[in-house]
Amino acid sequence: RLSGTEYPQEVVLSGSHIDTVVNGGNLDGQFGALAAWLAIDWLKTQYGAPLRTVEVVAMAEEEGSRFPYVFWGSKNIFGLANPDDVRNICDAKGNSFVDAMKACGFTLPNAPLTPRQDIKAFVELHIEQGCVLESNGQSIGVVNAIVGQRRYTVTLNGESNHAGTTPMGYRRDTVYAFSRICHQSVEKAKRMGDPLVLTFGKVETRP
């Protein structure tokens, strides 16, 4: 954090998240957090103290890939994270959110944090994670908004029976039902057009 010389009460925040999605790239998130630190260090060396306060931030559990909760870091900045929402959640291995925080040296607050009112701007460097820039022969893009996330867990209940002897007309096959739901949902998303995106990210069948 570098304090501003003329407008110390106004903060330019820069950074990114340090978690990534399952099978994500090495540069997802972490690149932006490290780049912010390097940029501020270089700017201080070249130009001295900034006019406005500049602060680097690294946020965790933004993606929701480990725990069923997204934007934990950024929600806390704006006082939108309710500790009760994560107090009893666990990852796929049974590790609790609270224990994971403790392992990193943090404790879960008892109540939502006070939202910050000093942020003047937020600057983040991030890889595209897509193909639009490359397809258009562009090396960099500037955006002022990103997609929001909605995640749903859908349970389809069918009937388990012998796969080799149950006639097709007697089956209540949830995999077949899911395949139809998946196909129709994706086709509807295509008809609605950009910037809407839709993904079925995880499918489990039992038995």
Describe each model-derived feature in a short phrase.
Residues 1-25, 43:
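Acidic/His- and Gly-rich active-site-bordering loop/insert found
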Residues 20-90:
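A generic, well-ordered mixed alpha/beta core segment in the N-terminal half of proteins
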Residues 6-7, 49-50, 116-117:
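Extracellular/periplasmic catalytic domains that process cell-envelope and extracellular macromolecules
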Residues 3, 42-45, 186, 205-206:
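Short beta-turn/strand-loop junction motif enriched in small, turn-promoting residues
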Residues 1-3, 12-15, 30, 152-153, ...:
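Structured catalytic/translocation cores of nucleotide/phosphate-coupled proteins
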Residues 13-15, 49-60, 195-202:
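Beta-strand segments within the central parallel beta-sheet cores of soluble alpha/beta enzyme folds
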